[in-house]
């Protein structure tokens, strides 16, 4: 075939991935070659005639082989993009999805509803890589806020802490407490400190059923952490526990946004009503599927949703 250049490598990689039924063949080839050469994807196309070194060719070949095993690109490159940040990720954490960015949008919007001189306490349950908590700290335009981010995996928390330290300025990373807990820390000190003081609750909990897990794409099923995906027999088990356990910690006027799946949205709505006695709003994602449950919870008045 002669000398290899960027164009030939891309064309070969895309065609090879298509023949092997690798999802997003073009994107996979572009990202892998971009990583090897240290180019942006745009720069690849501006440097079609660049001829990689032998070492670069060998590295590209190695990454191609990993992708053929259906290992997600994010795990191969150990990085994932979420809103305006780049996160370090491993197989100990779920790869953040674009739909989850909607949770951040809802929380940022809710913050504007609180008085300007109030300290805002935000809790995220199931932080994983820290994508949501770090994005909130990065994008919040107020100074008086504190974020508590919990996860039941110590390895995930190590990654989240590392991401916060590398992405955020110290004054912002210091405002996030990463705590090991299934949902809510059980120690008395935490309960005394945050009882009735959480203003905003966000969570992207597991919501896949046991049977649903078997139907997931191979690259998800074999490589992403099952504990972060599967909730149980129905897929809705985690929500009822979240709703019940966070209730004593919510402030007098608090906001909640949790990610859901359209297969469990009806059940989750009923679980919310049973705990809080009111009706939240379900918002759609980019594909018009039920994706985010949002609600204002006022303990001295009927619940008001944040829906438009």
Where are these regions (language model features)?
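A short N-terminal interaction module
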Residues: 1-60
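Conserved SAM/SAH cofactor-binding pocket of Class I
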Residues: 102-215
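Residue-level signal for inorganic ion chemistry
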Residues: 32, 70, 100, 132, ...
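Conserved AdoMet
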Residues: 35-110
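C-terminal lobe and adjacent flexible extensions of AdoMet/dcAdoMet transferase-like proteins
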Residues: 294-300, 308
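Mobile active-site "lid"/loop adjacent to the S-adenosyl-L-methionine
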Residues: 206-237
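Conserved Class I SAM-dependent methyltransferase catalytic core
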Residues: 233-296
């Amino acid at each position: 075939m002669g000398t290899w250049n960027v164009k030939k490598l891309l064309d070969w990689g895309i065609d090879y991935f298509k023949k092997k039924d690798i999802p997003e063949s073009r994107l996979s080839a572009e990202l892998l070659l971009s990583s090897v050469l240290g180019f942006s994807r745009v720069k690849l196309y501006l440097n079609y005639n660049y001829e990689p070194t032998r070492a670069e060719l060998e590295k590209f070949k190695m990454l191609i082989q990993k992708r053929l095993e259906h290992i997600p690109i994010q795990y191969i490159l150990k990085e994932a993009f979420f809103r305006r940040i780049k996160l370090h990720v491993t197989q100990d954490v779920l790869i953040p999805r674009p739909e989850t960015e909607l949770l951040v949008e809802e929380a940022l919007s809710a913050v504007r509803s609180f008085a300007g001189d109030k300290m805002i306490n935000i809790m995220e349950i199931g932080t994983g890589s820290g994508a949501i908590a770090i994005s909130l700290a990065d994008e919040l335009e107020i100074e008086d806020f504190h974020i508590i981010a919990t996860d039941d995996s110590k390895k995930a928390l190590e990654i989240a802490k590392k991401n916060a330290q590398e992405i955020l300025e110290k004054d912002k990373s210091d405002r996030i407490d990463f705590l090991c807990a299934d949902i809510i820390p059980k120690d008395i000190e935490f309960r005394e400190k945050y009882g009735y003081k959480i203003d905003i609750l966000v969570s992207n909990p597991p919501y896949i059923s046991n049977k649903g897990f078997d139907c997931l794409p191979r690259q998800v099923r074999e490589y992403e952490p099952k504990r972060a995906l599967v909730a149980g027999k129905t897929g809705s088990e985690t929500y009822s526990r979240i709703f019940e356990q966070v209730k004593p910690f919510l402030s007098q006027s608090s906001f909640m946004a949790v990610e859901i799946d359209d297969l469990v949205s009806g059940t989750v709505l009923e679980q919310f009503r049973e705990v809080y006695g009111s009706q939240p709003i379900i918002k759609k994602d980019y594909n018009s599927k039920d994706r985010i449950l949002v609600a204002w919870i006022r303990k001295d008045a009927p619940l008001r949703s944040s829906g438009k």
